[in-house]
C-alpha cells in the first residue's frame, strides 16, 4: 500500500512539473507573439520561441531525472542553467 501511495505521489509531482513547464512555455510564446514590451528591457530582443522551448525541455528532463534519482536514493545534481 505504501508503494502505491509513493508511486501516486511521484506521478503527481511529475505531472505538476510538466504542467508548470507547459504553462511557462505557453506564456512565454504568447508574450513573444503578441509582443508585450514590458517583458523586455529597452533595446533588447525578445527571447526566441525555440530557446524558450529548448530551455523548458531541459528543465523538464532534469526534473524528471532528479525525481527518479530521489526515489532510487541516488545523489543529486544541479539543474542546468
Swiss-Prot record:
Keywords, A to Z, come to: Developmental protein
Q: Which organism is it from?
A: Rattus norvegicus
Keyword Membrane present in the record's keywords: the answer is no
Stored InterPro entries = Neuronatin
Q: Which gene encodes it?
A: Nnat
Q: Name the tissues where it is expressed.
A: Brain.
Q: Name one GO cellular component term.
A: cytoplasm
Top-down, what is the taxonomic lineage of the species of origin? Eukaryota, Metazoa, Chordata, Craniata, Vertebrata
The reply to whether Disulfide bond figures as a keyword in the UniProt entry is no
Q: What is this protein called?
A: Neuronatin
| UniProt record similarity statement | Belongs to the neuronatin family.
